[in-house]
Structures are given as C-alpha cells and as structure tokens.
Amino acid sequence: MPEEAETFAFQAEIAQLMSLIINTFYSNKEIFLRELISNASDALDKIRYESLTDPSKLDSGKELYIKLIPNKTAGTLTIIDTGIGMTKSDLVNNLGTIAKSGTKAFMEALQAGADISMIGQFGVGFYSAYLVADKVTVTSKNNDDEQYIWESSAGGSFTVRADNSEPLGRGTKIVLYIKEDQTDYLEESKIKEIVNKHSQFIGYPIKLLVEKEREKEVSDDEADDDKKEDEKKEMDTDEPKIEDVGEDEDADKKDKDAKKKKTIKEKYTEDEELNKTKPIWTRNPDDISQEEYGEFYKSLTNDWEDHLAVKHFSVEGQLEFRALLFIPRRTPFDLFENQKKRNNIKLYVRRVFIMDNCEDLIPEYLNFIKGVVDSEDLPLNISREMLQQNKVLKVIRKNLVKKTMELIEELTEDKENYKKFYDQFSKNLKLGVHEDSNNRAKLADFLRFHTSASGDDFCSLSDYVSRMKENQKHVYFITGESKDQVSNSAFVERVKARGFEVVYMTEPIDEYVIQHLKEYKGKQLVSVTKEGLELPEDDAEKKKREEDKAKFESLCKLMNAILDNKVEKVVVSNRLVDSPCCIVTSQFGWSANMERIMKAQALRDTATMGYMAGKKQLEINPDHPIVETLRQKADADKNDKAVKDLVILLFETSLLSSGFSLDSPQVHASRIYRMIKLGLGIDEDEPMTTEDAQSAGDAPSLVEDTEDASHMEEVD
C-alpha cells in the first residue's frame, strides 16, 4: 500500500521560474539532459569524496555510474545515478521550497533575453527538465535516510512520500514524462548526439539502455510457445517481442519425427557506454602515449590526420585548471573567416562541457590551436557575456598563450616539423606580431624568411643577427611580391655589394609586421626602399659622396623642376650600383609594395591613399653612364628638349622597376615608341603610310602642354 503523500507549495520565485520555462519557447531544449547529467556527476563526486575518508559509504553500491533509459511505450526518459542521493529534507528544500540565490537573477536574465542554457549557472538546472517533460518524478535514497519519491506536474505544488517499490540502494532516479511534441528525445540517436556534444568527458560512465536484435535458431514448438507467450504479454507490457522470420524449408523431411527448426529474430536490451573517451587531460602526462593523444585529438576535432604537436599541462595554486593543446598539421581553408563559428578550444568546468567557441579563451591569431580547458574555478555554465568580465578567464587566457609559445618554441627544435608548421601557420604568427605587443619579441623569434645569403632555405632573424658583420648596425630588409623580384631589385644592389645580408619579405602581411616590429635584439630593422639609408663607409667613400653631391647638384635641381609635383626631391643615391635611378619613399609613407596592396583593397580609403602614398623621391646613380651623360647634356643646354624627354622617361621607368604602377601606362608606352623611332633614325616629321598611321595611333608628344614648357623656361 503506497505511503500517504505530503503536498508542498513551490516557493514563489521557483513557481514563476517553472512557469517561464514551461510557457516560453526555447529552441535549444536539449540542454535539459546536460543539466541532469551534470547534477548526477556532482552527486557522484560527493559520494566519492565522502568515501575517501569513510570507504563504508560505498557499501550501498560500489559502482559509480549514470544510466539513461528511454521508454517509447511509456513515453518516459529515466536518468539514474549511484551518487550521494537526497534525504526527504533535501528533496523538499532543494527541489521547491527554498529558492536558490540565483533563481530571481536567472529569471531576470531570461526576461532580458539571456539563453536558457545558462540555467545551471544559477543553480536551478534541475528545472530545465520541464522544457521537455510535463511531469517529473525524483526517487532518491541517501545513506542517512529512507527512500523517498518527489513528484510534480509543475502546477504550483509538489508531493513527497516514502517509496518502498524498487530499492535503489543509493542514488537518484529521475523519470521525465516527455511531452507529446518532444518524443525525439526518446530516440537512441538523439540521446547519443546530446551526450556526445555536451557530456562526453563526464568523469563517470554514462550508460544508455539500448534495444538490439540477434538471430536465434529454435524448434517449431519453442517458437509457437514463445509466440503465444508474446501475444499474451503484448496486452499489458512492452517486453521484447519475438518475430517469426520464416521456416527452414531445407529441413530433413525424411526424418518425420525430427522437429523442424526456425530462425527467429530476438529483441533484447543491453547497456551501451556513451562516453568511452575518458577525460585524458585529468591523467598524468607521463602515463599517456602519443597514440592515446592521437586518438583523443581525432575524436575531439574529427581530423583524419594526427596532430603535429601537443602540450598537456595543469596549473595549480590560487587558480586551478588543466589544459590539453594541439597544433594540427594543416590550416583549415576558412581559418580567417570571421563569420564562421570556430570549434577550436572546448571549455569545460569540472569536466562538464560549457562551450566550444569561447572567443576570449585564446587570441584570434592562435585560432588554429585545438584542445580543451577544464577549469575548477569558473561557475558552471557561465555565459559568454559574463566570460568577458571574468578575471579567472583572463588568467587562463594568459597561461594558454604562454604555454602555446612554449609549444611552438619546442617545435622549432625539430627543423623538419617546424617547416611543416611554418608553411601552414606563418600568417598566424605574423598576425600575432601585429596584434600582441606582450608577446611580440617571442613571436619574432619564430619568424622565418628567405635572405640574400640563405639560398632556398628559410632563416630566423636570430640567425641573421648572428651573421651580421662587425661594422653592421642594422637589419636590412626589402618587401615585395616574390623572392625573384626583390633579389633582383635595384634597392639591394649596394647593400649586397657591401656584403650585407638582406631579408626578403614577400608576403602581403609582412608589411603589417614591420610596422610593429621596429627592432630585433637591439638591432633596428631598416628598409632598403625608404629614404635615408645609411651604410657604413670609410673616409674615402664619404669624401666621394660629398663630391658627387656637389657635382650633380645642378642636375638634381633641373630634374626636380621637370618632374615638379611628381616627386618630393631628387638626390644622389648611395644604394645603386647597376641601375641609373630608383624611387624611394619617405620613412613614414607606404613602400611601393604596400601601395600595391592598398590599391588592391576593395574598401580602400581614397583619402588615406592620398597622403600615405604621396611622398616619393628620385635617387640617381652618379656612377652610371646614363646619368653622367645626362648631366653633361644638361650643363651644355638646359633647354634641350631631349633632356626633359629623357628625365620623364627615366622617372617613369624607375617607377616601374621600383615596384610602383603608372597612372598612364599608354602615355609611357608612346614615349618608348618615340625613343625607338629615334633609335632607328626615323624622322619625327616623316609622313607614315596609311597602314603605319592606323597601327601607331595618335602618340602624344613628350612635352605635351604649355605648363611643361613654362617649367623649362623657369629653369632658365
């Protein structure tokens, strides 16, 4: 005879909360299972902790586990744990009459638009059961009390009574009477999916009672008896049925006394463990093989390849957390797609999954790192909004970055593997130099470049510094589109001739790197394409430079006047050997390469383009025969039309060779054709045939307008 039930009213705030949960639509109802499994795990933690000092606490049940039993016929989902259990007092107080401190706060958060998945953070995760159930019973047995059953259909009250039906031994059994429109939560596949997503690394076995089939050979008599028995049972129970799949037509007909055999399919149930991948991060790293790390990495990331490197560590003291970080072998094709949710580092709190896209857990430039972080100090189910303000998370982030730096540093010791890593993730490191001022120096150590002395190999800035000549003060570099382009550039002629190594930076992101990486190990990084290049020189070289400056002063002034606003100034160069001239930019303006990159931007700022790309100066090579002959020609006749033609042509050609683009390529081409005609001895005024005229088109004169002519007069 059932015990008489006591009825209790829900505390007002809890009644409001339940009403809110029941009457509001939430899309991610699946979190109810996470919350109930999390509570079960907490109950198991408590009994395990008590058993450390008193092993007899486990006499009522040695095995610690969580079990899920879906029953489609009855429409119920049962969650059983062998945890500490609840006394009658616990059931009354914890499940209804005493509001948790977070109840009101959670309701306010919900009404303000917070996600239902935050419910556990406020200590009221149990009530999420009413997202999918219209009635819940909780049977519980604590070592210090009898077995009791709590029941409520959320109508403002609940009942508690003693329960003598099925002894639990110890622990809690929650039965959810699933709503008619939520029966998909009784499907094996759905339950497995939710457990795999949210509770895969709970520290106790999660078992699911699954229904399976097996073939069994029986005699006709047995089959008939079984069938009759099944038909009888089918009226009032959902026990396994036996299904006839046909007779064996090849039975031995000669022996009439022999009983015919039948193959039948027999349904049966068994427990299937859902979380076989144990929390590997909770184990001692010394006890874990590379194969185990590999298996865990693949289960975590769904990658088919092994990881490239792994870092397993724990932090203890005022703050406690464990972490397992992996570097993959390849970069995903959508690594820098900001709109895509990245599944990189999974955040757990006490082995309960919280979120897999915690942006504040690691900087964006390290978004290729995969792994898990399991904190003992964060509140369970902390929201994204609260994470941004959480001091614990900031400390975890700092430690993760530090350990990632250590991991990459360890990888640099294996040259072959580091090359694989660098080929895939060099952009991330360079983005880090751009964004992370605290770790800029460390990240600079990881960078690798081709240089004028490295051949086909990459070398580090540290290697470069170790090879610097005694009289070399700076690290020289050049940016450009490709190794071939920069290695043949006019800018590196003198530097290479002096025996100084030049770093080749050929990725667009390198331009952003050098804006922030001004020096390395006390050595200033100097661009060979910018004005003011200083090279070590002796007294004789210094004297020659001063003489050249005086000798070509008048030519520089003339060229400056001819080019007018196209250049800021014309000066004698100390960087050229084989080229007659080059275009350099100001220290704070864009290089030719940067200007090219910015012009390619779809959303470029035209105003910024104007003042950042404006400052150019033309440097001439005093030792080049073209420049020397031009000087002599200009000294002989400053008004010589050919001098102006040649100056403009030299300027436009040096623009191209220095990496800039021409505003009017057609005009430049016409000038080249005119020069070709002169070289071939074709008279400028000689009439062309009709065919020639059609093919040549209207070539602009080299001196097109009166404005240019007036500049020539000013030179006089």
Curated annotation (Swiss-Prot):
Instruction: Provide the binding site for ATP.
Output: N39, D81, K100, F126, R384
Q: Motif (TPR repeat-binding) spans which residues?
A: 712-716
Q: Where in the cell is it found?
A: Cytoplasm
Q: Where is this region: Disordered?
A: 213-262, 687-716
According to the record, the segments passing through the membrane are none
Ranges of biased composition (kind: Basic and acidic residues): 225-244
Pfam families associated with the record: HATPase_c_3 (PF13589), HSP90 (PF00183)
What's the domain of life for this entry?
Answer: Eukaryota
Tagged with keyword RNA-binding: no
Question: InterPro entries recorded for this chain?
Answer: HATPase_C_sf, Heat_shock_protein_90_CS, HSP90_C, Hsp90_fam, Hsp90_N, Ribosomal_Su5_D2-typ_SF
List the residue ranges forming a coiled coil, or say none: none
Q: Name one GO cellular component term.
A: cytoplasm
Q: In the record, what terms sit under GO molecular function?
A: ATP binding; ATP hydrolysis activity; ATP-dependent protein folding chaperone; unfolded protein binding
**Keyword terms:** ATP-binding, Chaperone, Cytoplasm, Nucleotide-binding, Phosphoprotein, Stress response
Entries under Gene3D superfamilies matching the protein: 3.30.230.80, 3.40.50.11260, Heat shock protein 90, C-terminal domain (1.20.120.790), Histidine kinase-like ATPase, C-terminal domain (3.30.565.10)
Give all Phosphoserine modified positions: S219
Record's comment describing the protein's domains = The TPR repeat-binding motif mediates interaction with TPR repeat-containing proteins.
Role of this protein: Molecular chaperone that promotes the maturation, structural maintenance and proper regulation of specific target proteins involved for instance in cell cycle control and signal transduction. Undergoes a functional cycle that is linked to its ATPase activity. This cycle probably induces conformational changes in the client proteins, thereby causing their activation. Interacts dynamically with various co-chaperones that modulate its substrate recognition, ATPase cycle and chaperone function. Required for piRNA biogenesis by facilitating loading of piRNAs into PIWI proteins.
Subunit architecture: Homodimer. Interacts with shu.
Family recorded in the similarity comment: Belongs to the heat shock protein 90 family.
Name listed for the protein in its UniProt record: Heat shock protein 83
Query: What species was this sequence derived from?
Result: Drosophila auraria
The organism's lineage? Eukaryota, Metazoa, Ecdysozoa, Arthropoda, Hexapoda
